[in-house]
A protein has these predicted regions:
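Targeting-peptide/extracellular-domain and disordered-appendage signature
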Residues: 2-13, 22-178
Length: 178
């Protein structure tokens, strides 16, 4: 069990490192995007529910949900669901549907504190062809068969399953947005 935990922990650290490296490399050449992407400013007024969705005028955004789950037999698990949308420096003016303008990255993690085990999976794809997207307006992000959607009543639907574990959740917020 410890070997599996160490292997998963190493993969998780490598994923986070790869994500930061990718963002660092992609931000080195900002000149192509500087005229179209907006800076993030502290006084930007948010208007909900429209601002729950994607903002293609900004470089990077993410939808992040964490929490604790309890089974019927009182076993507890921690979970994390994250979707990222990243505007690339590539093909902005290219009208082709094949042009990679945005990348969607998704990460799913489930922790079992009773045995010190962390399971996680990740996926990455460019937006397009209904395989990966981040919708403007209300939350709607998808990568392959994984998705996070906010319904009109405010409930979030999550479906992220892999070959060995996964989550299907219906979540109702109990607090206002931060």
């Amino acid at each position: 069990m410890k070997q599996s935990y160490k292997k998963n922990k190493k993969r998780f650290v490598m994923l986070i490192g790869l994500l930061f490296l990718m963002i660092s490399v992609m931000t080195v050449n900002d000149s192509a995007l500087s005229s179209r992407l907006l800076p993030v400013l502290p006084d930007h007024l948010l208007v909900f529910p429209n601002d729950y969705g994607a903002h293609p005028d900004f470089r990077l955004e993410w939808w992040y949900i964490t929490g604790w789950l309890e089974t019927d037999d009182k076993k507890k698990f921690g979970f994390q669901v994250t979707f990222f949308r990243y505007a690339t420096d590539l093909n902005f003016g290219n009208p082709s549907r094949f042009a990679a303008k945005d990348v969607v990255i998704a990460h799913l993690a489930l922790s079992d504190p009773a045995v010190g085990r962390l399971m996680h999976r990740e996926k990455t794809a460019r937006e397009g062809f209904d395989l990966a997207y981040s919708k403007q307006g209300n939350t709607g992000v998808k990568l392959d068969d994984w998705f996070l959607v906010r319904e009109e009543n405010g409930t979030y639907q999550v479906d992220m399953r892999s070959e060995d574990f996964g989550l299907q959740l219906s979540l109702r917020p109990t607090q206002k947005p931060m």
